[in-house]
Amino acid sequence: RARGGADGTDGDASLAPGGAGIRLPRRNEALAAAGLAMRNLGDIDRQSVAGAISTGTHGTGARLGGLATQVRGVRVVGADGEVREASPAHEPGLFEVSRLGLGVTGILSAVTLEVVPAFLLRAQEEPWPLDRVLERLGTPDDPDGLVGGNDHFEFYWFPHTRRALTKRNNRLAPDEEAVELERLRTTGPGPVARARTWVAEELLSTGAGELVQRRATAVPRGPPRRRA
């Protein structure tokens, strides 16, 4: 239980203690049941809580930190078997090293996370010309730029082309959430939308991408040369 318990929250609704060995999907399910969520996550959620924070897993968003920044307390089992509790107020040195330490201080058996009320994200994925992306990146303080104007922004450049795939994720305002939740309850995604999602995420992003990478590994070649 200490290693893998899917605890909810303690008396403070913003703090969620739990076993460090629990996988992120189970932790997120437990939080969602309480109307809560982690502030930021990485692209994948197959890791344990301890593994994700100890190795510096991060998501996107110029105003958001990695998973380690959400940690507010740890329980560490040292090589000698000693169990120590650490937080910003108690043994802060051990706390800082342990929350992003690759296990050098010992095994994390419990982690307390700072969480937020559950929220919805609106996702927009569009192909853009690379020049347009670079021109509009901006800085974290620029609300009109792609970086500062979105909660989460990332782009993937296709080598040897001038095209990029942009991804923007933004939290919905409470009134927008209510409208979106009602729409999902009454209609849900239609068959066309489900088919489009499957083609984009499974067939193209995963299946076709894997085939291209395997082909490139088996038959490598140099980058294309531009004609003078």
Where do the language-model regions lie?
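Noncatalytic alpha-helical scaffold of FAD-dependent oxidoreductases
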Residues: 1-228
